[in-house]
């Protein structure tokens, strides 16, 4: 069972796997642990990762990157419209209103959704993991930014489903970093001590995230998170690009923004310059050859200029930090350490801002690039039954407050309740109880739309169906379970209606017996029941009060939304009355049944089953096309490689092993094949290359075999000669009555001599025949036949010459009855017996011996 953590970033991805030795970040086919989040579409296939990034400038219109933030968003989203201006590829609306990416693939125009594009990237990551682990990969944990909303998270899960990955958990970036930090710490305070507070700061390519976490031994709790989704490394790159665009326009009269390829080259060079300035404070040059109109451009920048240029971006760093401290009610003195991750935190000015805010040096003990992926792999190992991991509980936080709104049965007013507050623990479930006589609707939304980096505050509409009044006309009690699951997604998981029905006669006796058992319960059970109800109340069993559709804590309890906890004392009093009062006339028995109710969910963003299945089928076809194209290219490369190899060797080691006529003929064929490859054979089917290779091998293979035989044959003949000399010498020693072999029967030794003579004759004949052959002719005997002869000789001779001499048994020595060793043993034995039987003599001492103590007791 595979355990894989995937850090899918806007610019690059990392894969971490769990092995017996621990967590390891694995490399791709280019021996690079960083896989770019880039996909390029061609006329025959698609390329993903490092190969796609190399085509980003030459195939700009069909190379897709920076698409992570498009998940779960509509095409008319203001963020999408703003980002569209800076992209080299086209964004168009889909039929469902989502974002579509238009590219040319297989010489046809295709429209892919963001889920499909992400699925393509996940396909590459899955393939890399499988090649490394040598087994199929299914289960994984995928990272997402902590500010991703329900719609965005559902979209990522759909992408994982398209590629056949079972995402065990969508893990927030900062939570993954915290897990990677805490699980290895041996000096964390115990559970009954004050937790250690650590702040994690992550500035990646496109976003800035911070979180405060409390650590105890084996426990991690996220206290709060804050973020700026629009502040990252690409913003610093954009500042440099703007600066040099203006400079080149003034200096060279070139408008870099007018040509997308020139702009992309400038972005790449500015990113390199930014990284160099992190380690150098001197002036650094920027040079681009043939930038535009065959003109070379150059410029320079130093760290001080860069910091001045990005002053407004650096000021934004403090805002999320202030928000975090305000939300968590922490003081700077409470923070034990500040850990930074993410590539952009390597900028000295960014480090300085963070350190200045907290008044302490930042810590860089975690790998800035791989920390998220490693944390995801650890979480996957914790969830997987295949690995035994140190117990470590992870409690995440809800980033945005979530509320429910519903309509009353008899009134037009609406009821509203905040079921999950900001930074509420997650995953978490709550049970709400409603009084209803018919189906009703619940709508979930984000309570603070201004704080959500998403234009739509609505999460979804949930209709609880099949609700009906009780037979006596009373409203039914409907229990609704709401949950923020492990993925950070809000859902109404279950709904049940409490239905009262008359009990049948055969059930009455069992009901009475149950009531008797309940009345005879020990006093501990009511407390336990009370504790359960308290837990439910802590989990938000109900909003406490309702006033004109709004909930306050000072008003009386809502008649519509009731708490089971509030009803417990009344039920106890009723039971007490029944016990204390004299028996009354029998009333009809009532049976309480919980009926599960269907829930219809209308979510803001969710791919339909038909559309999802279509995407799965499309991805499967593209994977197959990529595989076929790879096999075709491999076959073509094999022909090309064969041509180059033989053309070189025909003028070298193979020259003597082919006659002059065939030599010239084969050289012409190789040249014709090479020309065919670059002309007519440039784009042929796989079978055409296979046939071409077979045609070449018909001539080339015998030449290669003759060369190999000529290299191996003398060595094997030498080995055969050594074996023959060895057995011939043994036979001669036997004839000379050597003591080593005088135990061997003469008839058997004659067999050895016969085998040696026959093999010697065969070898001489073969070597004589081979000497008459030229090197360009097929050999008389091949190396494999000679090896078989050596094996035959060994099988015939070795069992005879290695016969062991028969053992001569020496006469057995008679055992003397009164030997010294025997007397000694008998004395020892008698001594032992005497020690056990006799009582101690010196001052009543007793040796620690069981038998002696028993004897003393008897005395």
From Swiss-Prot:
One GO BP: protein folding
Keywords from the named record: Acetylation, ATP-binding, Cytoplasm, Nucleotide-binding, Phosphoprotein, Stress response
Modified residues (Phosphothreonine): 562, 816
Spans annotated as Disordered: 515-585, 797-859
Source superkingdom: Eukaryota
Compositional bias annotation for Basic and acidic residues: 564-585, 806-815, 822-831
A GO cellular component annotation in the UniProt record: nucleus
Polar residues composition-biased segments: 533-555, 850-859
Pfam families: HSP70
Modified residues (N-acetylserine): 2
PTM entry text: Phosphorylation on Ser-509 may be important for regulation of the HSPA8/HSC70 chaperone activity.
InterPro entries listed in its UniProt record: ATPase_NBD (IPR043129), Heat_shock_70_CS (IPR018181), HSP70_C_sf (IPR029048), HSP70_peptide-bd_sf (IPR029047), Hsp_70_fam (IPR013126), HSPH1_NBD (IPR042053)
CDD domains: ASKHA_NBD_HSP70_HSPH1
PROSITE patterns xref list: HSP70_3
Modification sites for N6-acetyllysine: 471
Chief location: cytoplasm
A GO term, aspect molecular function: adenyl-nucleotide exchange factor activity
Subcellular locations according to the entry: Cytoplasm
Phosphoserine: residues bearing it: 509-510, 558, 810
Family stated for the protein in its record: Belongs to the heat shock protein 70 family.
UniProt subunit comment: Interacts with HSPA8/HSC70. Interacts with HSPA1A (via NBD) and HSPA1B (via NBD).
Function: Acts as a nucleotide-exchange factor (NEF) for chaperone proteins HSPA1A and HSPA1B, promoting the release of ADP from HSPA1A/B thereby triggering substrate release. Prevents the aggregation of denatured proteins in cells under severe stress, on which the ATP levels decrease markedly. Inhibits HSPA8/HSC70 ATPase and chaperone activities.
Record-given protein name: Heat shock protein 105 kDa
Organism (species): Bos taurus
